[in-house]
UniProtKB/Swiss-Prot annotation:
This is DNA-directed RNA polymerase subunit Rpo6. It catalyses: RNA(n) + a ribonucleoside 5'-triphosphate = RNA(n+1) + diphosphate. It comes from Saccharolobus islandicus (strain M.14.25 / Kamchatka #1). Keywords: Cytoplasm, DNA-directed RNA polymerase, Nucleotidyltransferase, Transcription, Transferase. It is found in: Cytoplasm. One of its GO terms (biological process) is transcription by RNA polymerase II.
Amino acid sequence: MGLERDGILSQDLHFNEVFVSLWQNKLTRYEIARVISARALQLAMGAPALIDINNISLTDVISIAEEEFKRGVLPITIRRRLPNGKIILLSLRKS
């Protein structure tokens, strides 16, 4: 019984490592929604846009925040805490 349990634990650990490596540089839909809503709030409170909004037909703050996110100009870093205690920092700014 102990050997079966060790085999299952090692498979679970391997699965967790693969899962973490796959999702390490991707954002979840909830993280994306949180970033866009936080940036839209900043824009609504008077923060300057990080893209030139004169050349595009975007007028509402959510569309502007989405466009800034798509272009990768947001100076925001996501701190993701993993179940094993590790912390991963994901920068949204594309170089």
